[in-house]
Amino acid sequence: MSEKTNDEKLLYCSFCGKSQREVRKLIAGPSVFICDECIDLCNDIIREEIQVDETAKLSKTSLPTPHEICETLDQYVIGQESAKKILSVAVYNHYKRLRNLSKVNAGSDDIELAKSNILLIGPTGSGKTLLAQTLARLLDVPFVIADATTLTEAGYVGEDVENIIQKLLQASNHDVEKAQRGIVYIDEIDKISRKSDNPSITRDVSGEGVQQALLKLIEGTAALVPPQGGRKHPNQEFIQVDTTNILFICGGAFDGIDKIIRARSEKSGIGFGADVINQNDRKELNKILGDIEPEDLIKYGLIPEFIGRLPVVATLRELNEAALIQILIEPKNALVKQYSKLFSMEGGVELEFREQALVTIARKALARKTGARGLRSILEETLLDIMYDLPSIKNVSKVVIESSSTNDDLQPIIIYAEKPKLARSSK
């Protein structure tokens, strides 16, 4: 009798029929019960269906051609035609491979298409980060920027390399499938170069050690990411993210690498026919960077295995005065357009830059050696006083920025609107 009573009190899963003693958890609903095992099974089914839907969605949406990718880059990045062409082809091939991944895996020819990660080499402010950002926006994929200088080997003070994937997961709203098709841009990659050519007895945790840690991540591995971010702790659950199909773009200025290239070129030059390069000639410097070889990067401090994971190399030229002026006025989100819109919000005030003022701004950026990155700070300094006073000044129609003919100082000139004539009151 007691056994029957116990059986009557025992609860069972409405789906698989297991009793509450056979499962870890039994959740009650309105007149039904479901066990933890059935919940896991349902989650797996939903996850698989979402994955199929995402793949179908990707295959239906048209992938822009290299020409279309390059045209979009032209709207935001001035110059750098060679780098844009290389990037357009590399990114197109990468996402074409992803869209046809199921066909490739099902193929009988056993040809495995490996991904081609990208290395961007160019001076500060030449457009490396902007190129990567524009590509991610065009392709509508998660994008994250990581600073190589903050990375250290696991177990040391600093950021673990897997934190990069954690940030990418956050950028994709914790959608693992979406994150696994994203783009990671690692900036300042030249700063993790090996400190010396000879192996050291002391561990190089922020140089060669980081390169070693990045190898598997860039090539493809199952990265374990804490669900809510933060540092890893024992006994906690992790989200597994496969980095095999994540596109890694690494960028760096590689200051001084031109000397390494020049030294190699001089060794191969024979007699009086060898080219003599003027170090102060910017055009020649750009030409030198275009001749970069893997051995130059090894000499600089990157390990051969790391260079091997970045087969596509694109060099960006140093921007000259004309290019900086173009950057100020031509791109879709040009700085002059941005500040003009900001001023128009102040009661429709028009902002105008005289031609000589643009030349002065470009020359100041060249003097600071910060490339296009320095343009915004120069504009902020120039417009600070007028932006401070403008909300308190009445009846302003236009602000003109012109350059002084004596000392190249930038001066804002305020133009007031004509006061409307008052109608005579009839009494």
Curated annotation (Swiss-Prot):
One annotated Gene Ontology cellular component of this protein: HslUV protease complex
S-S pairs: none
GO BP, sorted A to Z: cell division; proteolysis involved in protein catabolic process
GO function term, MF aspect, one: zinc ion binding
Residues that coordinate or bind ATP: P123, T124, G125, S126, G127, K128, T129, L130
Coiled coil (UniProt feature): none
Alphabetically ordered keywords of this record: ATP-binding, Chaperone, Metal-binding, Nucleotide-binding, Zinc
UniProt entry tagged with the keyword Chaperone: yes
Annotated residues for binding of Zn(2+): C13, C16, C35, C38
Classification via PANTHER family: ATP-DEPENDENT CLP PROTEASE ATP-BINDING SUBUNIT CLPX-LIKE, MITOCHONDRIAL, ATP-DEPENDENT CLP PROTEASE ATP-BINDING SUBUNIT CLPX-LIKE, MITOCHONDRIAL-RELATED
Entry similarity comment: Belongs to the ClpX chaperone family.
Function: ATP-dependent specificity component of the Clp protease. It directs the protease to specific substrates. Can perform chaperone functions in the absence of ClpP.
UniProt name for this protein: ATP-dependent Clp protease ATP-binding subunit ClpX
Organism from which the protein derives: Nitrosomonas eutropha (strain DSM 101675 / C91 / Nm57)
